[in-house]
Amino acid sequence: GYFYNYAFLYNDTLYSICTGELNEFLIYTADTDGMNRKLAFTAELSLCTMVNPVLDGGRLFFVGSEFEMNDTDSVGLRENYSLCSVDLSDFSFEKYMDIGTANETVIGKKSLLLYKNKIYFQHSEYSENSVHSAVECYDIDGSERMTVLEMEDSVNVWQCNGGKMLYVVSDDDDSHSQVCSYDLDGGGTEVLFKRDGYVSDVCMIGNRVFYMYSTADGKSEIRSAGVFDTSDGKDLTTEFDGDVYVSVLGHTSNGHLIHYQDSERDSFGLLSDEDFWSLKFENADFKFEQ
């Protein structure tokens, strides 16, 4: 048996990324109708599913995971992360470099970015009383590695938008956040806005930023969504009744593809541009539920 992790369409071929019985990394290919399915690639290392893989120029970049015995650890196993790629034209595999271990390096869904033939990787290291976060830049051939951004705070990267890297800086107890933009071409950081609570799922389209955030009232966590307009500073928010999660998956000429999850449903649907910026998620045309 195996588990499906991701699926995507590229050059009229359907690709599915799976984890096998031994946690090995597998890629299956099929026609666009799902027929003629076959195993195209397998690797002994595992896919780190905490980080979304990135497709660029026919090459799939991902974070690989391997376990080794560790006599200094009470658990006896150490999970090592590495930066890898698979060329979809011939399924050649390349492992670029080691990038940390699971017990010392914290990474997120959008930690891996590609821009102008360079790979950007965001990670954080936590100790008992401090946190250190960094964004490193690698040449796509792995020949050079440099740090472009680092700070003693918790950082999560969420998007690369036209050469601007959007990220959130949070304090130790997640009670305050600031949403920032870093210029990948010229350097320099701009603070777009600040908000009480923990901000996540940041997505910038044009001058407007969609985001999720959570605050605590002492008894429970309050989940909300917001839209911040960088052109005039206006901030529209809506508070959810219960534990609700919304993320933006993509955009079409007809609207925005969203993932909506609460205690009763786990759904994917298309939301019109007007309803999206008005935060009227109940108007989405949900096509698929898990």
Segments the model singles out, each with a brief description of its role:
Residues 152, 156, 170-180, 185-255, ...:
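Intrinsically disordered, low-complexity segments enriched in Gly and acidic/Ser/Thr residues
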Residues 1-48, 57, 97, 104-105, ...:
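N-terminal "mature head" segments of proteins
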Residues 79-81, 86, 91-141, 148-151, ...:
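Solenoidal tandem-repeat scaffolds enriched in leucines and small polar residues
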Residues 1, 36-43, 92-103, 144-150, ...:
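A short beta-strand motif characteristic of beta-propeller blades
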Residues 22-28, 68-85, 123, 127-137, ...:
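Structural motif
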Residues 31-35, 86-91, 139-143, 183-187, ...:
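Short loop/turn segments that connect beta-strands within beta-propeller blades
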Residues 15-17, 61-64, 120-123, 167-168, ...:
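Residue position within the beta-strands of beta-propeller blades
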Residues 2-10, 46-57, 102-115, 152-163, ...:
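Repeated scaffold domains used in trafficking and secretory/extracellular systems
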